[in-house]
Amino acid sequence: MNVFVLGPAGSGKSLLVKNFSAYLAREGYVVRTVNLDPGVLDPGYKADFDIRSIFTVESIMREMGLGPNGAILEAMDRLAHMKIPDFGGADHIIFDTPGQLEPFLFRDAGRRIIGGFRDRCCFFLGDLTALKNNLLGFYLYALTAYFTLETETIAILNKVDLLTPEEAEGVREIVRSPLRLTKPSGLRDEMSARLLKALRRFFPPKRVPLVSAKTGEGFEELLTILYEIKCACGDLT
C-alpha cells in the first residue's frame, strides 16, 4: 500500500512517517519511506528515497533567483515530472509530503504525483490541540484532499497524547455523534449542523482515528484501516 501522509504544517507528518513505519516493521512488514519535502532540514528519519538528494528549496532559490514561495512551487512542478521509485517488493511505502500543504494540494502537481501510484491512500493529519473546537473545518479540508487528489483519504487527529483523558473522550464523542452533539445557537452553528447533515447524505461516515505520532497510540487502528482499504471489503465506519 502506498500511503501519502498529508496535513498542514505542524500537524506531525514527519514524526508519523518515522514512527508508524517503525511500527509496521516491528509487525513484520517490509516498509519503505519516501521524503517528498524538499524544504525540510531534517525529517528525523533516514528515507529510502529523499528528494533532497536531487534538489532542495534552497538550491532552487539559488539556481533560479526565486524567493521561498516561488521555489516551493517550482519544486512541486519538478516533482510532478519525476520518476519516483515504487519499491515493488515492499508491503507498505510511506510518503512524507511537503510541510506547506497548499502547493501540493491545490496545484496539479499533487494529483500527478499521487496518481502515478496504484494501490494508494492518503492519511490527512490534523493537530488535535488546535482543532478540537473546529473539527468540521478539519473534516472539510480532508474532504477537499479526497476530491482534489481522487484518492481514498482518511482524516486522522494527531497529538492525542497532549489531551487529558476527559478531553480525548469528549472529542471521541463528537466524532462518533456530531449531529447529536451539535446544538445550533447562532448562524455559524446552524450552518455547521446543516453542512454535517448534507455531508452525511452523500458520504458515508468514516472513522476518524485519534492517534499520537509520538507515543504510537492508535497505530493499530491505522493498520486495520490499511487492511480495510486494501481488501475493499472492510468497514471504515
Where are the regions that the model predicts?
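Hydrophobic beta-strand scaffold residues
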Residues: 31, 153-155
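Nucleotide-state-sensitive switch-loop elements of NTP-binding domains
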Residues: 1-6, 11, 15-112, 118-121
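Canonical P-loop GTPase G-domain recognition
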Residues: 152, 161-237
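Conserved Switch II/interswitch segment of TRAFAC-class P-loop GTPases
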Residues: 92, 97-106, 118-139, 150-153, ...
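Active-site glycine-centered loops adjacent to acidic/histidine catalytic or metal-binding residues
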Residues: 37, 156-158
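Long, contiguous binding/interaction regions
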Residues: 145-148
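Well-ordered, non-membrane alpha-helical segments in soluble/globular domains
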Residues: 133-142, 188-193
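Conserved strand-to-helix beginnings and helix N-cap segments that scaffold or border functional pockets
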Residues: 17-18, 106-108, 135-139, 220-223
